[in-house]
């Protein structure tokens, strides 16, 4: 598809350049690994805390955890992007919650390159018809096969 750009494997840094001054900030997109934590912000927080001085991005967008969230961590606008996969038996067994949906993000950048504002409009989708159909199948009587 011509409207998509492959940013690479696991993580990518994109320059956000101010249209008049040319000053830049960095946006990081990342698909990290690991399991889901009890606190929604824990995994992004630990990733951002692990950056060396001078390498933190201004904005970080995370996938993988099936969560939607905006939080500021150590001066970084951290966003969890949500997912397009609804909860399945595996997720239910692991006691996970999936946030199905995504976000529209608006950034306002100062002439010195600093990201002053980060506005996120989250859109969450709740389609329980599939899950309800699956659950209703389990309440039907079981019939023994004749021999």
PLM regions and their residue ranges:
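Residues that act as N-cap/strand-start positions at coil-to-secondary-structure junctions
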Residues: 8-10, 99
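Conserved beta-sheet core of the metallophosphoesterase superfamily
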Residues: 24-28, 33-118
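A short C-terminal boundary segment appended to hydrolase-like catalytic domains
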Residues: 109-147
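Short acidic-hydrophobic surface loop/beta-edge motif
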Residues: 10-22, 71-73
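Active-site neighborhood of divalent metal-dependent phosphoester bond hydrolases
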Residues: 1-6
